[in-house]
Swiss-Prot record:
PANTHER family, per database record: GUANYLATE KINASE, GUANYLATE KINASE-RELATED
UniProt binding sites for ATP: 12-19
Gene3D superfamilies to which the protein is assigned, alphabetical: Guanylate Kinase phosphate binding domain, P-loop containing nucleotide triphosphate hydrolases
Taxonomic lineage of the native organism: Bacteria, Bacillati, Bacillota, Bacilli, Lactobacillales
Name of protein: Guanylate kinase
Ranges for domain Guanylate kinase-like: 5-184
UniProt gene name: gmk
Protein source organism: Streptococcus pneumoniae serotype 4 (strain ATCC BAA-334 / TIGR4)
């Protein structure tokens, strides 16, 4: 039976490069990763595949899963629910596959309450000036929105203490390599492997 995979929770401010670093990790790593598929109540768009792009559910089905405690984390955005289904994550982990969960800080804090032994990694910019330059460089937000994102980033960085690791994204390949090193080390953490080695030890004789 394969060892259980790691749940890797990956967060950071908007514009820090989470998606870019995550893609670099997937493309350059020899490890088997599964990018977590989210669940949503929004309408399925042309070309989207249920179970690949999202798990598409009705609002009633989603809310029932919430009541049953079957969502690792969830939020409502523009009238639709988005979240991470617990059953899907557990089934993947049980196959010995590491699950990569790229979510916002508030969602990560929800996950920490339910899966405290997950690996929590916070991706940081070198500094706030660099983060602002990246947001401006995307060319998708107004100056007002960028200012709001910077203020939000300050709040999120203040919550970094809730994470296990902080990785600076100064260069994408370097940041990806640092994350891979963290994941590799976590696979050898004593708390994760001790059960296997305890099985090798002789059992104490029963006291009469």
């Amino acid at each position: 039976m394969a060892d259980r995979g790691l749940l890797i929770v990956f967060s950071g401010p908007s514009g820090v490069g989470k998606g870019t670093v995550r893609r670099e990790i997937f493309e350059s790593s020899e490890n088997q990763f599964q990018y977590s598929v989210s669940m949503t109540t929004r309408a399925q768009r042309p070309g989207e595949v249920d179970g690949v792009d999202y798990f598409f559910r009705t609002r009633e089905e989603f809310e029932e899963l919430i009541r049953q405690g079957q969502m690792l984390e969830y939020a409502e955005y523009v009238g639709n629910y988005y979240g991470t289904p617990l059953t899907y994550v557990n089934e993947t982990l049980d196959k010995g596959i590491d699950v990569f969960l790229e979510i916002e800080v508030q969602g990560a804090l929800q996950v920490k309450k339910k899966v405290p032994d997950a690996v929590f990694i916070f991706l940081t910019p070198p500094d706030l000036d660099e983060l602002q330059d990246r947001l401006v460089g995307r060319g998708t937000d107004s100056a007002e929105v960028i200012a709001q994102r910077i203020e939000k980033a300050k709040e999120e960085i203040a919550l970094m203490r809730e994470y296990d690791y902080a990785i600076v994204n100064d260069q994408v390949p370097l940041a990806a390599e640092r994350v891979k090193c963290v994941i590799e080390a976590e696979h050898f953490c004593v708390d994760r492997v001790i059960g296997h080695y305890q099985e090798m030890l002789p059992k104490s004789p029963t006291t009469r």
